[in-house]
Structures are given as structure tokens and as C-alpha cells.
Amino acid sequence: HYKFFIIEDRKFSDIGNTFKNQYLNGPFKIKDNSDMITAHGIAGEGIVKTFSEINTNKNKGLLMVYEMSSKNNLISSNYKNNIMKYVVNYNKDIVGLITQKRDLGPDSILFMTPGVNIKNNNDSNDQKYRTPEDAIIRDNCDIIIVGRGIYNNSEPQKTVEIYKFLAWKAYKNKTLSM
């Protein structure tokens, strides 16, 4: 058996019933083939409530989009306040936040951050990047999410090892300075 989690990074963002049909009945069998899923709170509490009702054994996790790494995104402080309310009210289901930095929130959830790249600061698609060190030490996130920094590289396997090394080094430096 493998020792990793499968995250369906679909960023669900619809009403509860539509989400339920996609999660339970879609062709990709998301409920059976993933350990965690990502979702936006833009449609309100319905998606979180529905996930909680479906997740009866509490063996699946919900990662809520809290902030985005794209320039000029429309996430507001009101949106973020509501996400934090969901984190408190659905603490057995929401296991983490997709965010740019650790904000106020319980220590029991993971702060996962996209937009990590060691070669670029931004791209032509309005993506803002930062280094693993900045994401982990300065922004106090737990887990980095690297996409294009790996799959746009000619040696992706070697590149994964570099990111792994840099992230672990940053994590150790952060914990030593606490």
C-alpha cells in the first residue's frame, strides 16, 4: 500500500445537491477514489453541510479554498470570515485550507499553499509565485502545492526531489526557531 493521500483538486463550487451528485455518482467515482477534495465556499454553506452529511464515517477530508494565488482574485474578507465559521462548525470534516498564509484558525487543520515555484515570481496568466522557504517560514503554511514548477520542467522527478528537500529544510528551520 502507498503512504500518501489522493486529493481531488476539483474545487467544487455549486449548491449542495449538484455537489452531491458529482461526488457520489459522477463517472470518476470521486468519493471512492479520493481521500480529500477541494471546494469553494462561494455558493454558501450548502456544499460543506452536504459533505458532512455524506461523510458519515468521517474518513474523508474537505479542503476549503480560503485564498488564491492568482493576482486580482475576488476573494473578500467576508468570504474568508464565513470559511472560518465553517471550519469551526464542521471541524470533523474540514481538514485544511488552501491559502496564501496561515491566518487565525485552529491548529488542528492544515494550511496548504499553492503558487510555489523556485524559478519564477509570476507568469503571463496572473499567477503569483513564491519560494518554498517563503511559503513555509514567512507565511507559516504547513504544506506547499507545486504544479507548473514540476510539470513544466524537463526533469520532473529530479525537480520533485528539489522541492521536497527545500520544503523539508524550511520546515526544520521554522521549527528550530520556535
Q: Where do the model's predicted regions map?
A:
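Chitinase-like catalytic core of GlcNAc-active glycosidases
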Residues: H1-F4
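Catalytic cores of alpha/beta
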Residues: N17, N21-G26, N120-N140, K158-Y163
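Conserved active-site and cofactor/substrate-binding residues in soluble primary-metabolism enzymes
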Residues: G46, N82, Q127-R130, S154, ...
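Conserved, mostly hydrophobic/aromatic
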Residues: D9, I37, A135, G147, ...
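A short pocket-lining beta-strand/turn micro-motif at the edge of beta-sheets
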Residues: I109, N140-V146
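Conserved anion-binding
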Residues: I6, R10-M112, I118-N121
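C-terminal helical cap(s) of enzyme catalytic domains, especially alpha/beta-barrels
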Residues: D134-R138, I150-M178
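Glycine-rich beta-strand-to-loop/alpha-helix junction loops that act as flexible
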Residues: P114, V146-G149
